[in-house]
Amino acid sequence: MFRNSYIQQNSDIQAAGGLVPMVVEQSARGERAYDIYSRLLKERVIFLVGPVEDYMANLICAQLLFLEAENPDKDIHLYINSPGGSVTAGMSIYDTMQFIKPNVSTTCIGQACSMGAFLLTAGAEGKRFCLPNSRVMIHQPLGGFQGQASDIEIHAKEILFIRERLNTLMAKHSGHTLEEIERDTNRDNFMSAEAARDYGLIDAVIDKRPA
């Protein structure tokens, strides 16, 4: 599995106590309780929080497909606070974002690093945002493998292919050349919200909802 190096230092971030707030709605039919994320899903809001891994990616893909079926013409809002994670899991989210009909607006809250930054940049053009104190970090993928020399060679070729593919897609979404992306992702490259906007990873920094 190919991952990013930053997540290894930040994988212990967990929701406080693992508690999820509940929201109670009242209607003519009575009361119904939702966890906060399910309630926000009704408003077409999806949260990508924590390390990107297969289980989380499957849930996000399912939510994207569900919201497309609900209304294929209304935007979906993806909020990202992630140190990054699995490349293959992240690419499943990316492909689903591009596959569905609704525009997916992305917003960074907190941090969007590595695969998190890649998914932030993959939002619909003109609809990619950061909150003012967000941090964005781009870099090349990290992979490790042990085994026979021939197997190591196979995996080395694979990670080079993945790096080129990620760089090509980031160049497409950011407006940079492939050479510029290769240079700027050679090492961990941290950016403020304003720097991410100037670089083309997002379209605007927002501090309040539009009136």
Swiss-Prot record:
Top-level lineage group: Bacteria
Pfam families: CLP_protease
Compartments (UniProt record): Cytoplasm
GO biological process annotation, one example: protein quality control for misfolded or incompletely synthesized proteins
Main location per the UniProt record: cytoplasm
Catalytic reactions on record: Hydrolysis of proteins to small peptides in the presence of ATP and magnesium. alpha-casein is the usual test substrate. In the absence of ATP, only oligopeptides shorter than five residues are hydrolyzed (such as succinyl-Leu-Tyr-|-NHMec, and Leu-Tyr-Leu-|-Tyr-Trp, in which cleavage of the -Tyr-|-Leu- and -Tyr-|-Trp bonds also occurs)
Keyword match Methyltransferase: no
Gene3D superfamilies tied to this protein: 2-enoyl-CoA Hydratase, Chain A, domain 1
InterPro entries, per database record: ClpP, ClpP/crotonase-like_dom_sf, ClpP/TepA, ClpP_His_AS, ClpP_Ser_AS
Annotated catalytic residues: 114 (nucleophile), 139
CDD domains registered for this protein in UniProt: S14_ClpP_2
Enzyme class: hydrolase
E.C. no: 3.4.21.92
CC terms in the record's Gene Ontology section: cytoplasm; endopeptidase Clp complex
MF terms (GO), sorted A to Z: ATP-dependent peptidase activity; ATPase binding; serine-type endopeptidase activity
Family, as annotated: Belongs to the peptidase S14 family.
PANTHER family associated with the record: ATP-DEPENDENT CLP PROTEASE PROTEOLYTIC SUBUNIT (PTHR10381:SF70)
Function, in words: Cleaves peptides in various proteins in a process that requires ATP hydrolysis. Has a chymotrypsin-like activity. Plays a major role in the degradation of misfolded proteins.
Protein name: ATP-dependent Clp protease proteolytic subunit
